[in-house]
Amino acid sequence: MAQVIYYLPGHGGKLDSALGKELMRRGFDIAGRSTTGEFNQLSFSDQVQTIANDLERGFWFEDAKIVANSFGAYLFLHAQALLPPFIGKVLLLSPIVGEFTNDEKMMSFVPPKTDVLKNLVDTGNYPIPINIEMHVGSEDWQSSPDSVQALGTKLGIFYTIVSNEGHSLSKAYVSTVLDRWLL
């Protein structure tokens, strides 16, 4: 029986495409939440609670693995805030960790409840998963490398800023990370 990975894709992502497809190609079964359809219709708080419930009910063991990408990582970080520190392994790729602005592209994004996450981190009350790492591209304008570095430093989380990569980390880089992380 294949090990099941709990996967949270970025906004508008499906479990069986892109990274989910690669995880299945490597022999894993995928569970989690596509960020489309019925799940996407839920309020942010209900999405977060649904993920927290999923983790408590089916993925709360030491060998459990969670992979989250972009906005899926933001959802995970908020779900984790409702739970004790996760005891399995967590991999966050191009994680959205708060609001961002890019003057060059004239784009900005303020995700829901950024103040909740920030306050928990700043007060030392965020329940840090036991085994977590984050990877972000140095040229990522959606997942600010500076914000990922600040979060990683404050919480003592391993992070990597990947030179010359943007929000969509290259398949070659992600493949190398998965080769090591999935062991």
Each language-model region and where it sits:
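Gly/Ala-rich beta-loop-alpha elbow adjacent to hydrolase catalytic centers
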Residues: 67-77
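Catalytic histidine neighborhood in serine/cysteine hydrolases
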Residues: 30-31, 149, 153-168
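Catalytic histidine-centered segment of alpha/beta-hydrolase-like enzymes
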Residues: 41-42, 165-176
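Conserved alpha/beta-hydrolase "acid-adjacent" motif
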Residues: 141-147, 170
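Active-site catalytic motif of lipid deacylating hydrolases and related acyltransferases
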Residues: 2-61
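Short beta-strand/loop motif that positions the catalytic acidic residue
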Residues: 127-129, 133-136
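Flexible "cap/lid" loop of the alpha/beta hydrolase fold
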Residues: 44-47, 95-122, 173-174
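Active-site nucleophile loop of the alpha/beta-hydrolase fold
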Residues: 35-38, 91-100
